[in-house]
Amino acid sequence: MSLSTKREHSGDVTDSSFKRQQRSNKPSSEYTCLGHLVNLIPGKEQKVEITNRNVTTIGRSRSCDVILSEPDISTFHAEFHLLQMDVDNFQRNLINVIDKSRNGTFINGNRLVKKDYILKNGDRIVFGKSCSFLFKYASSSSTDIENDDEKVSSESRSYKNDDEVFKKPQISATSSQNATTSAAIRKLNKTRPVSFFDKYLLGKELGAGHYALVKEAKNKKTGQQVAVKIFHAQQNDDQKKNKQFREETNILMRVQHPNIVNLLDSFVEPISKSQIQKYLVLEKIDDGELFERIVRKTCLRQDESKALFKQLLTGLKYLHEQNIIHRDIKPENILLNITRRENPSQVQLGPWDEDEIDIQVKIADFGLAKFTGEMQFTNTLCGTPSYVAPEVLTKKGYTSKVDLWSAGVILYVCLCGFPPFSDQLGPPSLKEQILQAKYAFYSPYWDKIDDSVLHLISNLLVLNPDERYNIDEALNHPWFNDIQQQSSVSLELQRLQITDNKIPKTYSELSCL
């Protein structure tokens, strides 16, 4: 690949074919560095400075600002447009890339089909098939600049960039060039907010839900592996909401508890002229969900369920003390941090499986309504109500008692493998079963379960929130102290023989369908 321009820039690595044209009458000294295109082709490890001019043209024509002479490059292949956006109360200078070519412009392996794509830090951009670059915005501080230059100057290493591994090229520059570039960058980016893509490298997808997808990511400086929840795009038309998002995430980042997934960082990122995405950076828990454990084992032992459930209640107690109501407690939102046994002499710290030393419960997705909008969040809950309290379904006022109802459903599922409310147990319908608190402990599934557990569940799955256990009553229940409850379960909640046509399928059985 050959690349040329018509005027040298201080701060760029240059050779006889690496020059730059200024098409504006504005003196070049008045332009400042907005970012760089770093050449990824072996043997062509140079970087092109992209300034804050209104339009930068790329193509084979000698009138282009950046000239690429490969045969698959169009005469006018692409344009970089300076885009100034007010996002999260910051004026951001961004680059909007527009494809003008026949052979395409590709961002991270995907062909650019829309005319409105905002480049992000670390994007890999390929013009045609032959010209491959890594794009980097200029850093917001001299420290960041030095770190970036040091990284790029070091030996080529392999990095994950969303969908593939690429080489980070070797680049060197003189100290005087670095000083000139750094001064220009500081002038432009004095108030530039830190972007998610400044701090993290995105990796593989971990999962997807109603509101967002979750990806793996790595902190560029520390190497820490994290999970990032990327919410679906929304209109950038309400700066008040963006400010509220920032304030609320700052509050949630102060939530620190052993049984809560830590929120580490948050970002608002523009993705087009009119749309933004919100990013939440979270502690990464590697050992799966409570739901997966139930599916794998069909149901959990009583001692195992007790140890996990007490941790769940302890985490909920902390959230409620911080005036945070979860409202979406379910096995998929209960993550497990498992310490594996490395040798037979290690002593177990709980009633776990043979290969496990200890398990720590981590509650995820607390405060989600703050990021999705109250109405959307509630409507989604009502659409999949298996664990939702009756007062949420009726959209009446509610308290932290909604989390105690959901916890009761989880304990029920842990011990028998299927939920107390389901369409399999109808009629009535699933929703009506919840609204009537109509459930039972069916034989033979509950025959060997202690009465004390039935008493606890029956005081959590209470229709009237005022009569439902609060968090302290649940934590102080005799079951946790191995005290048997005598004659405590009402007659209608005794173990009932289920009819053959209503035998429920466990989550394990349903997962095999």
From Swiss-Prot:
Pfam families for this protein: FHA, Pkinase
Domain FHA, residue spans: 56-112
PTM remark: Autophosphorylation increases in response to DNA damage.
Listed GO CC annotations: nucleus
GO biological process: DNA damage checkpoint signaling; double-strand break repair via nonhomologous end joining; mitotic DNA damage checkpoint signaling; replication fork processing
InterPro entries membership: FHA_dom, Kinase-like_dom_sf, Prot_kinase_dom, Protein_kinase_ATP_BS, Ser/Thr_kinase_AS, SMAD_FHA_dom_sf
Residues noted as binding ATP in the record, renumbered to the chain: 206-214, 229
Region annotated Disordered, chain positions: 1-29
Catalytic activity: L-seryl-[protein] + ATP = O-phospho-L-seryl-[protein] + ADP + H(+); L-threonyl-[protein] + ATP = O-phospho-L-threonyl-[protein] + ADP + H(+)
Keyword Nucleus: yes
Key words of the record: ATP-binding, DNA damage, Kinase, Nucleotide-binding, Nucleus, Phosphoprotein, Serine/threonine-protein kinase, Transferase
Protein kinase domain location: 200-480
Active site per UniProt: 328 (proton acceptor)
Start-end of Basic and acidic residues biased regions: 1-12
Residue numbers of Phosphoserine PTMs: 10, 139
Entries under PROSITE patterns matching the protein: FHA_DOMAIN (PS50006), PROTEIN_KINASE_ATP (PS00107), PROTEIN_KINASE_DOM (PS50011), PROTEIN_KINASE_ST (PS00108)
Modified residues (Phosphothreonine): 380
Gene Ontology molecular function: any one: protein serine kinase activity
Note, other: Present with 3480 molecules/cell in log phase SD medium.
Function: Transducer of the DNA damage signal. Phosphorylates SML1 on serine residues. Cooperates with the PAN deadenylation complex in the regulation of RAD5 mRNA levels and cell survival in response to replicational stress.
Protein name, UniProt field: DNA damage response protein kinase DUN1
Species in which this protein is naturally found: Saccharomyces cerevisiae (strain ATCC 204508 / S288c) (Baker's yeast)
Lineage: Eukaryota, Fungi, Dikarya, Ascomycota, Saccharomycotina
Gene that this sequence comes from: DUN1
